Regions:
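Acidic, polar-rich low-complexity tracts and alpha-helical solenoid repeat scaffolds
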Residues: 2-575
Length: 575
């Protein structure tokens, strides 16, 4: 069972004659260290338990019945000792919260053997730390430490002190952690002193006291092994790096052995890669980053490795490698702080390759999933530009464009484009639908009235009277100053006649006759259809008057074809 804090690493480059780098944002991986606190009669099996023993331990360990109120002190201590063993055992097999619950009943009990109290307090603090309750661990740690004030150091006390230091380290109270570790460092001996030195090294790293961190990290390494040794070496390397000794940091990272603890090993590979990158040895850096991605893909640090790797590829103009790495990165770490920037970079790569649909899909992920991103508006703007290209090639993308950006002028332009294209191809009815949709959904667009007028003319030509009425009415109602509004009124009136609404047509045509700017042709046309409208409602006298006046005007204009048309209409109207 392993856990690792989310690791965030930033690179800062300050120009001071040459590039200087600082590693920041590091966190020591949580390693569930379980100390062997000496020989306690009956405790050996408990203090050798491992995570894999959890099932057998829970099934085999049995607590005695709790003594009654009149129980003797020996009975009570025996019960509390068993309960303490059970709680420590639970923590050692990884059941931290359950272990803390059991130990909370005995942590304040005055055992006749103080060694038992040291074990209980140490594991009680570790249970709180490993379950993530750092503040409670710090609070109890302070209480325990107050009991040891001005008392001579011993190893049991040292483990409690170390655990209290760990609580402060993981809780972010680095200077306090350092001061707690100091008692073990100055007065203690053995493994607990060296673990305290390692903890102090990390506390100093967090406090940016790199020289102190380096000293503590180097002094403890001869006495540590396994994961604690690797943690000390990582601290040493980071301290050297941040003190400007990048070559020295590289040498340390190169000699760190794998531990089998994934968060620690992944951290070594990552920082080794980062160090080689700082030295401009990009191929070796990439090898280490790729190792993190391949072997530790389930850990957050692999996202950091992918982020750094794709930036190296971009710098080397290895576009395909960068693209594949970014895809890996954004698919696995959508919540990474750099995820939106990576998505935008990926979209731009696809755009440069004219793969517009893939470019659009990654831009869409930004503005659909990250509404608070600083790239939100930029991504939407870029997406509209891409849609404006692909919407002219595929009507499916046009409908997607309209759905996602219903107010986009580029979408309106694409509708006009399709209307014109279909009109040129002779597909008038399809063209009319595009023009009408454009005019209806973008009424404030400069070309909206023209689009509606074209659509209305097509409906009119094809005798689709209801559609024509609806379209021309929009123009008349919305654009009273449109340069073709009078024609729209005229076509509206005719469409109303053939749609079975002659009374409305008469109202429009009579209003049009009152215009002062009418020429004889316009007046004749209006009168002709006014006569037709009157005929439809059975007003023969008014119909004849209008048609005869139209006939005179057509004759004067030399429009003999229209004269014949009017004569035919008059033949059907009784006197």
């Amino acid at each position: 069972m392993f856990w690792v804090f989310i690791l965030q690493v930033e690179e800062e480059e300050v120009v001071t004659g040459k590039a200087e780098y600082q590693i920041t944002g590091y966190k020591r991986p949580v390693y569930f260290y379980m100390p062997d606190m000496g020989d306690l009669v009956g405790w050996n099996d408990i203090l050798r338990l491992k995570f894999e023993d959890s099932l057998s331990f829970v099934n085999s360990f049995s607590l005695p019945q709790k003594p009654g109120k009149k129980a003797k002190k020996e009975e009570l201590e025996n019960y509390y000792t068993k309960l303490a063993m059970y709680g420590v055992g639970l923590i050692r097999v990884g059941l931290f919260k359950e272990g803390v619950k059991s130990l909370s009943e005995v942590v304040d009990y005055a055992f006749s053997k103080p060694e038992i109290s040291y074990v209980i307090r140490t594991y009680f603090l570790l249970g709180l730390i490993y379950s993530g309750d750092y503040e409670k661990a710090r609070s109890y740690g302070s209480i325990f430490l107050s009991d040891y004030y001005n008392r001579p150091w011993n190893s049991g006390m040292g483990w409690v002190i170390w655990a209290a230091g760990e609580a402060n380290l993981y809780g972010g109270h680095f200077l306090q952690a350092e001061s707690i570790y100091a008692k073990n460092i100055n007065e203690g001996e053995g493994l607990v002193r060296e673990l305290s030195r390692m903890g102090s090294a990390w506390a100093n790293l967090y406090a940016q006291k790199f020289s102190d961190a380096l000293s503590q990290a180097q002094n403890c390494q001869n006495y540590l092994n396994g994961v604690p040794l690797s943690h000390a070496q990582i601290a040493e390397a980071i301290a050297k790096f941040n003190l400007g000794d990048i070559e020295g940091a590289k040498e340390v990272f190169d000699r760190i052995s794998l531990t089998g603890h994934p968060p620690t090993d992944a951290m070594v590979y990552y920082y080794r890669g980062f160090t080689y990158e700082a030295l401009r040895l990009y191929e070796i850096a990439l090898q280490n980053y790729q190792k993190v991605m391949q072997d530790y893909a389930n850990l957050p640090i692999s996202g950091e490795a992918a982020y750094r790797a794709y930036n190296i590829y971009l710098g080397q103009n290895k576009v395909e490698e960068a693209k594949n790495t970014i895809i890996w990165f954004v698919d696995r770490f959508p919540q990474h702080p750099e995820a939106t920037r990576a998505l935008y970079t990926l979209a731009e790569i696809y755009f440069s390759q004219k793969d517009y649909k893939n470019a659009l899909s990654y831009l869409r992920r930004i503005y659909q999933n990250y509404p608070n991103s600083e790239l939100y508006s930029v991504a939407r703007q870029r997406a509209q530009q891409i849609y404006n290209v692909i919407a002219r090639e595929d009507t499916i993308e046009l409908w997607n464009f309209l759905r996602e950006f219903p107010n986009s002028e580029e979408a309106a332009d694409a509708l006009i484009y399709w209307g014109g294209k279909l009109l040129d191809e002779g597909n008038d009815m399809a063209a009319a639908r595009f023009y009408y949709k454009m005019g209806s959904e973008f009424p404030k667009h400069r070309q909206a009235p023209d689009a509606l007028f074209t659509s209305g003319q097509i409906y009119f030509k094809n005798k689709m009277w209801k559609d024509a009425v609806q379209t021309f009415k929009k123009i008349v109602d919305l654009y009273p100053r449109y340069n073709e509004v009078n024609k729209a009124k005229f076509f509206l009136a005719i469409s109303l006649i053939y749609d079975g609404k002659p009374v409305e047509a008469i109202r429009i045509l009579r209003a049009e006759l009152s215009r002062q700017d009418l020429d004889d042709k316009e007046r004749a046309d209006i009168l002709k259809y006014l006569g037709v409208a009157y005929k439809e409602i059975g007003k023969s006298y008014e119909a004849r008057n209008a048609l005869e006046e139209a006939r005179v005007l057509y004759f004067g204009l030399g429009r003999l074809d229209e004269v014949d048309n009017v004569d035919k209409l008059l033949q059907d109207i009784p006197y």
